[in-house]
């Protein structure tokens, strides 16, 4: 994906960011994120951590928020597939760039992987694990 990896220099900005250098449509990204909430088969978004494991996951929330030049994507789920959050982020960014329509998210949930990109791992930060 286009973009540059930026390493913030400030002591309080030690988390990594995926720098895109373009404006994203945050409202479209949130509309796409809303389609991902609930219980779905996320096989297009990743693979099970166990061979033959199921790919159905319950996503409680996907929140896209923007402040100035920053856009944050937060995902909460009962469990994740390998690579799932990176693919969700990549899909939402493509919708935000207007490279894909909202309906594309529905096709991904239907199992299509056409056009699905993997966001770089550098921009991801695990915030919490709850049991």
Region annotations inferred by a language model:
Residues 1-131:
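Structured-RNA-binding interfaces characteristic of tRNA pseudouridine synthases
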């Amino acid at each position: 994906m286009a973009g540059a990896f930026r390493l913030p220099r400030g002591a309080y900005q030690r988390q990594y960011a995926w720098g895109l250098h373009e404006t994203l449509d945050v409202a479209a990204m949130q509309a796409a994120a809303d389609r991902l909430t609930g219980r779905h088969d996320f096989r297009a978004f990743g693979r099970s951590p166990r061979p033959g494991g199921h790919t159905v996951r319950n996503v409680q929330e996907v929140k896209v928020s923007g402040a100035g030049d920053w856009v944050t994507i937060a995902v909460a789920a009962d469990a994740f597939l390998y690579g799932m959050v990176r693919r969700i982020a990549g899909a939402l960014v493509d919708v935000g760039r207007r490279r894909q329509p909202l309906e594309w998210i529905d096709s991904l949930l239907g199992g299509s992987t056409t056009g699905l990109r993997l966001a770089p791992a550098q921009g991801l930060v695990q915030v919490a694990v709850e049991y």
